[in-house]
């Protein structure tokens, strides 16, 4: 299994920029082009929420056009910037697993050695996250049915504070209910989130929990400063690879850079250079 995982695309309407100066639509189109050009082709691309910025139909039209150019299956979940009804109307053609109920978007992918569960943690009208009773019950049933099969959950909001002064107040408010399932089910070993616009990792019992960078603009990690900073540090995504029982996640840069070059030991330490005595 190989998954490319991006997050927080924050598409805007045609010819509109984020915050008046960030061309997220062009940036995301470039990300799609880079993913389509990967030398090792993923089985699917995950987008973990905040697909658009303002929840408007015009934004979803752009998102569907740009994301629809990906040459891989899409696995989508909404975030707090998304409008549930518009999200489903415009993006279900790209991800049929979303179903038909905007209030109950969740699904399981059982095609790989690890089971993948996708849930909606968004709460309409709020930046913070919330897990509904139906979502928690569904997760419990899925984990019970899967037995010992390793399971990864994908959601938008992290289920616990991560020491980020700006983002912790708008994490998943009742994420403890998911952590309780981690305690009950040893098979729940990974939780991947968006929302925080930076790569942050922690461990809870047997579960590795991570938030992803965004595709365009980032939020710096500050432990004490609560002011709402953002910046244009280089974007990246995560690649999730599983071979046998081993799952490896690694960061893949989405910035433009020189290379790659093949390593050549003959030019690393050229033989014609005189080595000075120590």
Swiss-Prot record:
CDD domains the UniProt entry points to: MPP_GpdQ
Cofactor(s) in the UniProt record: Fe(2+)
InterPro entries found in the cross-reference section: Calcineurin-like_PHP_ApaH, CNP_phosphodiesterase-III, GpdQ/CpdA-like, GpdQ_beta-strand, GpdQ_catalytic, Metallo-depent_PP-like
Keywords, in A-Z order: Glycerol metabolism, Hydrolase, Iron, Metal-binding
Lineage top rank: taxon: Bacteria
Gene3D superfamilies for the chain: GpdQ, beta-strand dimerisation domain (3.30.750.180), GpdQ, catalytic alpha/beta sandwich domain (3.60.21.40)
Transmembrane segments: none
The keyword ATP-binding is assigned to this record: no
GO MF, any single term: 3',5'-cyclic-AMP phosphodiesterase activity
Function: Catalyzes the hydrolysis of the 3'-5' phosphodiester bond of glycerophosphodiesters such as glycerophosphorylethanolamine (GPE), a typical phospholipid metabolite.
Protein name: Glycerophosphodiester phosphodiesterase GpdQ
Organism name: Enterobacter lignolyticus (strain SCF1)
Originating gene: gpdQ
């Amino acid at each position: 299994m190989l998954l490319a995982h991006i997050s927080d695309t924050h598409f805007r309407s045609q010819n509109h920029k984020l915050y008046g100066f960030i061309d997220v639509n062009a940036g995301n189109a470039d990300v799609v082009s880079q993913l389509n050009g990967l030398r090792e082709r993923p089985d699917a691309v995950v987008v973990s929420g905040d697909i658009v910025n303002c929840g408007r139909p015009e934004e979803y039209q752009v998102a569907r056009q740009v994301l629809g150019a990906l040459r891989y299956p899409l696995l989508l979940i909404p975030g707090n910037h998304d409008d549930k009804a518009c999200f489903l109307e415009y993006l279900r053609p790209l991800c049929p697993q979303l179903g038909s109920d905007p209030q109950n978007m969740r699904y399981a992918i059982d095609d790989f050695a690890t089971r993948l569960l996708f849930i909606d943690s968004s709460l309409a009208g709020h930046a913070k996250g919330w897990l509904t009773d139906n979502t928690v019950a569904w997760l419990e049933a899925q984990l019970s049915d899967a037995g010992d099969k390793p399971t990864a959950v994908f959601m938008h909001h992290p289920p616990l504070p991560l020491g980020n002064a700006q983002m912790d107040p708008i994490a998943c408010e009742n994420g403890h209910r998911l952590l309780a399932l981690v305690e009950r089910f040893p098979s729940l070993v990974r939780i991947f989130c968006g929302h925080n616009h930076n790569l942050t990792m922690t461990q809870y019992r047997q579960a590795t929990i991570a938030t992803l960078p965004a595709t365009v603009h980032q939020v710096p990690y500050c432990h004490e400063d609560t002011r709402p900073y953002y910046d244009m540090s280089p974007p990246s995504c995560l690649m999730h690879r599983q071979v046998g029982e081993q799952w490896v996640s690694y960061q893949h840069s989405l910035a433009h850079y020189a290379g790659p070059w093949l390593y050549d030991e003959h030019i690393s330490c050229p033989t014609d250079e005189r080595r000075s005595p120590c």
